[in-house]
Every structure is written in structure tokens, then in C-alpha cells.
């Protein structure tokens, strides 16, 4: 139940009563606008009030957790990968206006997510929030739907990034040796090799992960600026820049749909690029002062990523020589674009920087996705949850969850042998699955929970919470069907957009699983709702009374 749950969360049994302690408010009593810098014990106590014991080391600072999510955006490789959407539908106006308009709503989603993260800083993230905020009787189903949508996005996102990295790596070989032809098995093997390296890196102790991702953030930012400077300098020297009026207003519609609808379709590029800024939410149990730093990480990632990404789009729009050749060419759009505006060696150099950034992006994805797997397994959602939900006593990281995601990623990569259409359809699901999960708990907050009954954390939107949340939900509700449209009205199988099938089929499968079996044993996240002398169980969640043993999934009835 949404309202009683929110009240009960602030009166958990233990050392402090509800008048003294609330997990949803850690403001400084002398200055309510200035949050306290909480201690390790305070972080653990906040987490215990959410129903979980502290198992990770809180070794991530604000910059560290921002580094994970910013690296996961991978602006340089993401912009390169999404050119078929951003410029491939409406030309340069799609690059510029598409990114700018969509970012307004993406920032709204980030703000709404950050507010929930501040109130409920747990690795379960969106899945946990959906259960707590859902109306009476719907908590378990809301958590199940949100959790699986988010997990599917993460599972598919990692292999898609690594496959793109492998394709760019072998494409660089092709630039050096034009007679070289890339084979599917080579893409598969290189992708697996990259994924295995990520498995090793994501299993390291948190302090090393923090350092690695900090370095990754610096490199991603540096490489992005180097790429923009080189492209601008070479273009200015060789062929000049495109006219401003043409760049901003001359629509080259490469679809069968009206210009306005085609611009909306171009939003796919920025939506795919920005589908990783929820990572701080899932890393909150490893973050110091999580109710403050994790939401800040979400907002910083969305804002800085959005601005820097748009600047990169402006650079491309003003320097592309022949956008029709880029869109209709048989080679990679990014490679074609670079070859137009740069000499061969410079193009190869920028492509190399893109490959390194893409590698770091994939590594961040596995870190975030493994924490999601761990949090879901801890609540009994995944098969063999008892085995998966284990933190290695030496590294203090969920190595088994990392391994599970690595294996599933390898299985997904086998689809590369089925051809470009199949593997492309699988990978296109990342954006729609991620943003469906992003707004599910926001919708619960907007439509089912009154402001007076929602106890905010140090970061909150105040009276703007519901208006911003409504904008977030409306945007995603509009974009979901648009992202499923093909670019032509009468598509062949090769031209069809299979996103609706690739996302719909597994989601339908997990919903059927819930109807047949899951509803009998899955009661939502296990949270500590009982105050002293009160053993009542609230619907929509499963009571966990603080046993030292890890809660296990109930036996199937």
C-alpha cells in the first residue's frame, strides 16, 4: 500500500523511533536546506530501514558514482552508433532540434528519478520504488514489471555496446587494409573477448572500480573534446562549414512519414544515448551519503551528458560534407562521415578514440547491470536467486551476479550469426526498455501518491514534483509507439522495426510467468516495515524483520 508503506518506512524497529529518524529526511536540523554528510553507520542504518543490511563497501564518492554513469553514456561512441537515427531520418535538423527538444523531457525524467533515489537509496532502485509507490494490491506486479524491463535493458545494452566496439575495431582494420572483410565469427569472438575483460574488471573491489571509472570519465571527456577539436580544425582547413540556415532548417526526410513525425523518430538517438543515467540509483548501496550523492549523480549525468552531446551534434551538423552519402552508404555512418571531413590517418585516430570510449562504456554497463541483478536476486526475483545474491567476502562485490550477466551476454551475442537484422532488432530494445522502467515508478508517484503522504529525501522537487513527473510520463508514453515505427510505410522484413517484438515477447513471457507462478511467492522487495511490537504485514511488499541471514525466496505454494 503506497501511503502506509511510506509512513511505516519511517518507524522501523530499532534504535530510533519515527519522531527521531526518517530515512526520507536527512537534512541538517540547524539548516534544513543543507544535508548532513552521513557516516558509514548512518548509511547502514538508512539502508536497514529500507529492509536491507549493509553488504557493500561504500567506497564511491559523488564523482565516482557520476563517473560510472557518465562512462556508461559513452557520448562519443553513442553519438557515433546512433547516427542512423539522429541524422538518418531528417538530416541535420534531426541532429540539432531532435536532441535539444528530447533533452528537455529527459532532464524532467532525471529530476523525477533523482527525487525517488534520494528517498529510497537502494540498489533495487526503480524496481523498489515502484513496489512502494504502487496502489494497494499492485506492489508486487509493479515491482516485477519495472524490474524486468530495467534488467532486460541492461542485459541487452552490454552486448550491444561490446558488439559495436568489436565492429569499430575490425572496421579500423578494414581502413588500414581495404581488402579485409569482416566475418560474423570474428565479430562474435572479439565481442566475447571484450565482455570477458569487462567481467574481470567489474569483479574487482569497489575502490579499484571507483578509480577505474574516474579514469574512464577523464578519458571519455578528453577524447570527446579531442574529436570535436580535430574535426572542426580539419573541416575549417579543408572544406569549411555548412550554412547555418541549411543546418537548422533544411529537412532531408529519408522516411515515408511527415516531417514532424520524422523529427520525433529522430529522438531515438538521444534516448538511446541517455539510457544509462540511472546507474547512480543502482550504485547507491556502494555510495557514501547515498541519499545526497546518488541523486546528484543522476542529475549531473543527464545535464552534463545532454549539453556535451548536443555540442557534438552541432559539430557534426556543421561539418558533414554530404549527408545523403552518409545516410545511404553501405559502410558505418560514423566511418563514412569521418572519411568525408578528415584525412585517412586523422579519421583512423578519431575512430581509435571512439573504440576506447566504447570499451569503457561497456565496462560501466556491466558494473551497473550486475548490481541490478544482485538486488533482484536478493529479493528472489531471478532463478537461482540464493546463489546469485552473494557478495564475495574478499572483493565485497557481487561476483556471481557479474558472472551471470556475462554468460547471458555471451548467449545474446550468438544472435550475431543470425545476421544484422536479428542482432540489430535485439539491440534496439535498450532505449524503450530502459525508459519504460524509468517512468513506471514516476507514474505511481504522480497518479497514486499524494504529496502529503510522500516523505522526500534531501533532494526533492517540492511543488514541482508532480508537474515534472507528469511531463516525464507523458513524453515516454508518446515515444514508446514512435520508437517502434519503421522508417517506411510498407516495410520489407529487412526494413521492419522489430523493437516491439523483441521487447514485447520477453516482457509478455515474464508477465505470464508472474501470472502462473510469481504471484504465489513474489511479494515485492523485502523491506523492514514492522515497528517494535507490530508484526503486521503490508500488502505489496514482503516483510523482512532484520535477520542476519540473507532473505530467501519463498517456496512455491
From Swiss-Prot:
Chain residue ranges for the region called Disordered: 17-38
One GO MF term attached to the UniProt entry: amino acid transmembrane transporter activity
Protein localization: Membrane
UniProt membrane topology term: Multi-pass membrane protein
InterPro entries membership: AA/rel_permease1
GO CC terms, sorted: cytoplasm; membrane
Pfam families (UniProt xref): AA_permease_2 (PF13520)
Signal peptide (UniProt feature, chain positions): none
Gene3D superfamilies: Amino acid/polyamine transporter I
GO biological process terms held by the UniProt record: amino acid transmembrane transport; gamma-aminobutyric acid transport
Transmembrane domains' residue ranges: 60-80, 94-114, 214-234, 261-281, 297-317, 348-368, 407-427, 468-488, 498-518
Disulfide bonds: none
UniProt keyword list: Amino-acid transport, Membrane, Transmembrane, Transmembrane helix, Transport
Family stated for the protein in its record: Belongs to the amino acid-polyamine-organocation (APC) superfamily.
Protein name: Uncharacterized amino-acid permease C74.04
Organism: Schizosaccharomyces pombe (strain 972 / ATCC 24843)
Amino acid at each position: 500500500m503506497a501511503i502506509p508503506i511510506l509512513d511505516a518506512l519511517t518507524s522501523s524497529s530499532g534504535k530510533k523511533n519515527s519522531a527521531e529518524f526518517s530515512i526520507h529526511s536527512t537534512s541538517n536540523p540547524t539548516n534544513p536546506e543543507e544535508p548532513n554528510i552521513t557516516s558509514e553507520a548512518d548509511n547502514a542504518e538508512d539502508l536497514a530501514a529500507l529492509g536491507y543490511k549493509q553488504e557493500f563497501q561504500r567506497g564511491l564518492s559523488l564523482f565516482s558514482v557520476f563517473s560510472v554513469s557518465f562512462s556508461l553514456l559513452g557520448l562519443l561512441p553513442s553519438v557515433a552508433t546512433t547516427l542512423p537515427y539522429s541524422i538518418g531520418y531528417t538530416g541535420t535538423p534531426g541532429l540539432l532540434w531532435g536532441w535539444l527538444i528530447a533533452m528537455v523531457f529527459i532532464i524532467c525524467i532525471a529530476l523525477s528519478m533523482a527525487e525517488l533515489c534520494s528517498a529510497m537509496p537502494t540498489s533495487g532502485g526503480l524496481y523498489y520504488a515502484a513496489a512502494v509507490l504502487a496502489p494497494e494490491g499492485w506492489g508486487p506486479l509493479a515491482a516485477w514489471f519495472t524490474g524486468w524491463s530495467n534488467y532486460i535493458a541492461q542485459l541487452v545494452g552490454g552486448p550491444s555496446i561490446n558488439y559495436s566496439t568489436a565492429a569499430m575495431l575490425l572496421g579500423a582494420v578494414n581502413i588500414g587494409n581495404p581488402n579485409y572483410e569482416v566475418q560474423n565469427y570474428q565479430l562474435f569472438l572479439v565481442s566475447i573477448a571484450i565482455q570477458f575483460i569487462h567481467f574481470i574488471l567489474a569483479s574487482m573491489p569497489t575502490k579499484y572500480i571507483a578509480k577505474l571509472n574516474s579514469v574512464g570519465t577523464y578519458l571519455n571527456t578528453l577524447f570527446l573534446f579531442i574529436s570535436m577539436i580535430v574535426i572542426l580544425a580539419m573541416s575549417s582547413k579543408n572544406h569549411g562549414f555548412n550554412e547555418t540556415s541549411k543546418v537548422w532548417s533544411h529537412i532531408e526526410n529519408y522516411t515515408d512519414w511527415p516531417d514532424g513525425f520524422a523529427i520525433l523518430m529522430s529522438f531515438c538517438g538521444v534516448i538511446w544515448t541517455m539510457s544509462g543515467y540511472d546507474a547512480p540509483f543502482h550504485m547507491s548501496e556502494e555510495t557514501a551519503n547515498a541519499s545526497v550523492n546518488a541523486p546528484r549523480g543522476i542529475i549531473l549525468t543527464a545535464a552534463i551528458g545532454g549539453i556535451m552531446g548536443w555540442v557534438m551534434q552541432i559539430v557534426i551538423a556543421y561539418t558533414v560534407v554530404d549527408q545523403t552519402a552518409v545516410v545511404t552508404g553501405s559502410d558505418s555512418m560514423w566511418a563514412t562521415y569521418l572519411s568525408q571531413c578528415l584525412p585517412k590517418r586523422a579519421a583512423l585516430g578519431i575512430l581509435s578514440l571512439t573504440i576506447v570510449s566504447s570499451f569503457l562504456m561497456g565496462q560501466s554497463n556491466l558494473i551497473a547491470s550486475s548490481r541490478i541483478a544482485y538486488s533482484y536476486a536478493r529479493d528472489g526475483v531471478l532463478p537461482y536467486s540464493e546463489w546469485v545474491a552473494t557478495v564475495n567476502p574478499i572483493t565485497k562485490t557481487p561476483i556471481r551476479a557479474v558472472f551471470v550477466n556475462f554468460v547471458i551476454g555471451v548467449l545474446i551475442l550468438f544472435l550475431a550469426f543470425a545476421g544484422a537484422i536479428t542482432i540489430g532488432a535485439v539491440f534496439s530494445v535498450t532505449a524503450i526498455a530502459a525508459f519504460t522502467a524509468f517512468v513506471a515508478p514516476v507514474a505511481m508517484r504522480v497518479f497514486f501518491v499524494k504529496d502529503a503522504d510522500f516523505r522526500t529525501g534531501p533532494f526533492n522537487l517540492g511543488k514541482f514534483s508532480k508537474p515534472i513527473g507528469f511531463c516525464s510520463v507523458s513524453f515516454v508514453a508518446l515515444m514508446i509507439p514512435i520508437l517502434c515505427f519503421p522508417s517506411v510505410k510498407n516495410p520489407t522484413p529487412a526494413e521492419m522495426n522489430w523493437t516491439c517484438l523483441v521487447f514485447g515477447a520477453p516482457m509478455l513471457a515474464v508477465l505470464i510467468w508472474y501470472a502462473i507462478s510469481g504471484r504465489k511467492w513474489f511479494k515485492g522487495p523485502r523491506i523492514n516495515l514492522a515497528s517494535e511490537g507490530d508484526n503486521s504485514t503490508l500488502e505489496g511488499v514482503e516483510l523482512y524483520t532484520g535477520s542476519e541471514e540473507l532473505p530467501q525466496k519463498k517456496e512455491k505454494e
